[in-house]
Structures are given as C-alpha cells and as structure tokens.
C-alpha cells in the first residue's frame, strides 16, 4: 500500500472512531494529500555528500547541525539518515545500546562550578601526532564556555586558554579538575603556578576523585571527538589555526541551537533562565594591571655582575642592581617581561625589561 506506520495507525484510529458511531459502512480512508515537503536543494545534497563521504564520516546529528549552521536549512537526524540510506552514504557504524537515563548531581548557579579538562587526541586529519583540546563547561547549564586546540598540554597553553575564556565570559567561583600536576600539589598549603594564578583572582580548585566524577566534561570530549575530526577532514583543514577558527564557529552554534538531552533545552536557554532567576555567581574579569603577568610562566632570575639577564640566546641590560633577584614572566604569545617583584594585589607591577617576540 505504500503507507508509513504513522499514516496506517491514523487511518486505523479513524476507522475505529467510525465504527463506534455506527458509521463503518460509510467510512472512507480519504486522501492524505501526498508529500508536501519540497526537494532538498543542490547545495544541501552537496554538503551532505561531502560530510558523509569524508574519512571519518560525520554522524547524522553532526550533518544536520552543519546544514543548519552553514545553509540555514533545518532538518533532523532521522531525515539525514533516511537520505543517506537512499543514496548509499550511510556511515558504517556499529549498533550502540541506548544510554539509560541517569539523574546526575549538579550545582544550582551559573558560574558556581566549571568543569575543566584536557583531551589528547589525533584531532587533525593525516597527522601522526596527537593534539590537545582544552575544554570548559558550566556544571549548572552545560554551557560550553571554551574549547581550543593546542599542540600539547603545557602550562602556557593552560594560561592562554583560561585567560581568553575568563575575559570572554567572566570568572567562576571554582574549577572542577583532576589530580594532574598542573593543578595539584601534595602540600595542602602550597599552590602550583596555575593554582596560584587562579587563587589570585578568587577562583578555587575542586578535585574529582575519579574520571567518572567528571562525567559532564568527559561526555563533551566524546562529543568533540566524534564531530570535529570528520568536519576537519571534510573541509581539508590540516593546521591548528584553521581548526581553532572552525571551533570558534561551532561552539556558539552548539550552545544556542543544540538541545541537551539531560536538560531538555539548549545550554544558551538554560543560561538565560539562570540569569532571569538571578542564579548567577559569575564575576566579570577585572581590569587588573597584573593580568598579563599573572597568566604567564614565572621564574626568579639573578641579575649578573654585568647588570644583564638572559633573553633567549643573548644577554640584555636591565634596570636592576647586579646580583639582585628579579621575576621573569614568559607570556603564552612569546613576549618576555622582567618585573621587580612577583604579582601582589597591594602593589602595581614595575616592568624592568620587555622583550617582545617580534
């Protein structure tokens, strides 16, 4: 008959209704009117072919999201899957058991806790090396506040990522992290350099006892690992600069348009609701003169008897007495500063020497 399941049960319900009113002899199925959906444009089918033919191929949900982001064409995962099966472009994916619903603990306020983690993975196509994705997600709203790729996980990459994200969104009360040496020291009264930078601006560290305890950020890693490499392969993006440019476009789209399964709404809508209900503890990034030096790798250097300090493979004169101790600050962008003393909220920075990277 060529009827779909939904149409069949609709007719069956109408027939039973007619029988209940003694009108079975006069009942007729009528006409459905046919398929009113217009054919997909050439641009839509071309983009779908590109995304589903790449190695690895994009998932159906990722392809539907890209149609909306790039072409403004809104469809669902099921329609993309049906088109892919008809055109022999279905990715060869194994059956996965549907996840069981789990009620997870979460904080109440926007900005109370951000889950933070790094994901080493072969993000770039045709690359033998692994790159690192640094990722931040708000625990209350699932708002992905930041995601950026780096060649490796270093102290400078953490400084660069966190300072960017804090300037864009503000300062949370705490970060939820693991026991990596970047965050944790066995002395409870001491800070790592990264911990000291966070403490300077009132951001605490909370430690997850197991990887499973950081489930929200781990699932976000899985989301990016399934979505980003196929898109990079489809667009032939082979460098970190281009990959981060694509991430800057994907991140707001995911926050604003993709429904989160546990929340039943988009992270953007969840954040707006928290703001409306005055459930926000996020603080704006301060206009602090110490900001570029707090987010830098600092070491203490002794001025030589010649009144000079090392700068790369050279020695430069500095406005400090010989044999005195100064603070060397290496910025993520490569700029080098020498300060008279370490960051102190009760004082202002005194720059003794600045050596730009260019």
Residue ranges and their predicted role:
Residues 8-11, 48, 63, 80, ...:
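Mobile genetic element proteins and their domesticated derivatives, centered on retroelements
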Residues 73, 84-137, 143-144, 155-164, ...:
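Mobile-element integrase/transposase regions
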Residues 194-284, 332:
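Charged alpha-helix within mobile-element recombinases
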Residues 138-139, 150-154, 358:
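A short acidic/small-residue loop/turn micro-motif
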Residues 166-188, 208-211:
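Acidic/histidine-rich, metal-coordinating catalytic segments
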Residues 251-358:
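C-terminal, beta-rich DNA-binding module of retroviral/retroelements integrases
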Residues 1-15:
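Double-stranded DNA-binding cores of transcription factors and transposases
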Residues 13-122, 270-275:
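Basic, flexible linker segments flanking DNA-binding modules
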């Amino acid at each position: 008959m060529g009827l779909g399941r939904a149409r069949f049960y609709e007719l069956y319900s109408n027939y039973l209704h007619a029988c209940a009113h003694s009108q079975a002899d006069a009942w007729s199925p009528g006409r459905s009117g046919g398929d009113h959906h217009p054919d997909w444009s050439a641009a839509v089918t071309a983009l779908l072919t590109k995304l589903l033919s790449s190695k690895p191929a994009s998932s159906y949900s990722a392809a539907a999201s890209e149609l909306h982001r790039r072409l403004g064409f809104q469809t669902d995962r099921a329609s993309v899957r049906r088109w892919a099966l008809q055109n022999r472009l279905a990715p060869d994916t194994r059956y996965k058991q549907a996840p069981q619903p789990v009620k997870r603990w979460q904080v109440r306020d926007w900005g109370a806790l951000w889950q933070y983690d790094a994901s080493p993975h072969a993000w770039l196509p045709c690359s033998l090396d692994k790159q690192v994705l640094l990722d931040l997600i708000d625990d209350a709203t699932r708002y992905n506040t930041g995601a950026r790729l780096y060649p490796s996980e270093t102290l400078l990459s953490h400084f660069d990522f966190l300072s960017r994200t804090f300037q864009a969104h503000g300062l949370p009360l705490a970060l939820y992290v693991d026991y990596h040496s970047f965050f944790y020291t066995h002395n409870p009264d001491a800070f790592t350099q990264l911990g000291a930078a966070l403490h300077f601006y009132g951001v605490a560290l909370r430690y997850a006892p197991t990887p499973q305890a950081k489930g929200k950020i781990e699932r976000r890693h899985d989301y990016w690992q399934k979505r980003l490499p196929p898109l990079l392969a489809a667009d032939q993006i082979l460098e970190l600069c281009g990959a981060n440019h694509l991430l800057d476009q994907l991140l707001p789209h995911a926050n604003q348009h993709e429904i989160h399964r546990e929340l039943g709404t988009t992270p953007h809508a969840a954040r707006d609701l928290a703001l409306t209900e005055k459930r926000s503890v996020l603080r704006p990034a301060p206009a602090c003169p110490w900001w570029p030096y707090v987010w830098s790798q600092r070491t203490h250097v002794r001025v030589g008897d010649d009144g000079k300090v090392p700068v790369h493979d050279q020695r430069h004169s500095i406005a400090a007495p010989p044999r005195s101790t100064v603070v060397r600050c290496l910025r993520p962008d490569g700029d080098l500063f020498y300060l008279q003393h370490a960051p102190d909220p009760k004082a202002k920075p005194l720059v003794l020497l600045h050596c730009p990277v260019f």
